[in-house]
Amino acid sequence: MLWCVAGLCLCAGAAPLVVGVADMCPSTNAVNVQATYVAAVATAGNTPVVLPATTDRELVARMLAPLDALLLCGGEDVEPRRYGAKPSPRLGKVNRRRDAWEFLLLDEAVKRRLPVFGICRGCQVINVYFGGTLWQDLPSERPGQIAHRSKELHSVRIVQGSRLAKSLRAENLMVNTSHHQAVKDLAPGFRAVAFAPDGVVEAIESDTLPVAGVQFHPERLFVLLGREEFRELFKGFVTRDGRR
């Protein structure tokens, strides 16, 4: 049986993917991955590998060599100077060391055509890395009818025909929301493929690379709430075939 996700095809029953999981504790810069990210990758049948944080380019290259995919996790705000903006008074904590590390990871992933999936901050990092910008604080810069940092779920509209829609087999879903920043100007070569009711971008994907990101937290929906539709994001949305 052959099924396709992220514009790529994978044979059912293929060997588990080895997925590098990148996260960092904001207060100590220590490696500190939330259990739900690891559990989502493992429960979907793949093998999670927690990556040590480093800005040593050679070491980053060696770490990514055996991987089949890379997962960029949620966390602090991205340093605004990386997208040519002055810090807003409402900017949250930034972690410049983490920014530098994740940009190095993306350098190497792009070089290898390694599939990359970003969640929350990870989606924002992808957009900034490829030349996009961010809303630094939605409540003050782009107020709308939705509280995007809330315990409440809200709906998202997924663009018909997008890789995300094909992966989730849906065009409307209820998702969680835990962010005060979001994609503002989309990076060249990317398209927005999901939107909140107030127009905030909820997912992006590359036109030419196996790279995508979502603003919500599918790992929590899958692992904590048992939302099986999100399994596919961790099973095959990024696939080994993407780096060929």
Kindly give the residue locations of the regions a language model identified.
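Catalytic nucleophile loop
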Residues: 123
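A glycine-rich beta-turn/hairpin centered on an aromatic-Pro dipeptide
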Residues: 177
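Conserved catalytic core of two-component histidine kinases
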Residues: 194
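N-terminal beta1-alpha1 cap of cysteine-dependent amidohydrolase-like domains
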Residues: 2-119, 127-129, 135, 139-167, ...
